Regions:
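Enriched for short, Lys/Arg-rich terminal
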Residues: 71-75, 79-103
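Basic, Lys/Arg-enriched alpha-helical interface segments
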Residues: 1-66, 100-102
């Protein structure tokens, strides 16, 4: 049985999810709720298999490596902390937005 990681969601990522929900709710409250549920399901799945996801470009120490997982038109950026067996969700952005330079 694979090791399960705990998940933490940064205040920035929570704010991102709230903004996404508010923006989509303007045109379709039902779609907004469904989208947020899908994003949270994708985040929850990171507890079992966080490593296969694409690595954000850039030279970083392994502990600073940022990975990304696309879901619908959005991208979830996260970091894996092997020492604490934790997946840290950093931010959630629309795929058309420029990738963050800093996390």
């Amino acid at each position: 049985m694979p090791l399960k990681y705990s998940i933490t969601i940064s205040p920035r990522a929570i704010a991102d999810l709230n903004i996404i929900h508010a923006h989509v709710s303007i045109s379709s409250p039902q779609s907004a709720t469904s989208l947020i549920q899908d994003l949270f399901r994708a985040i929850d799945r990171l507890n079992e298999l966080p490593h296969p996801h694409a690595i954000q470009s850039g030279r970083r120490k392994p502990s600073q490596t940022v990975r990304r997982v696309p879901i619908h038109r959005f991208v979830i950026y996260f970091r894996i902390d092997e020492a604490t067996q934790t997946v840290n969700v950093l931010t959630v952005r629309h795929g058309s937005r420029q990738r963050p330079r800093r996390f």
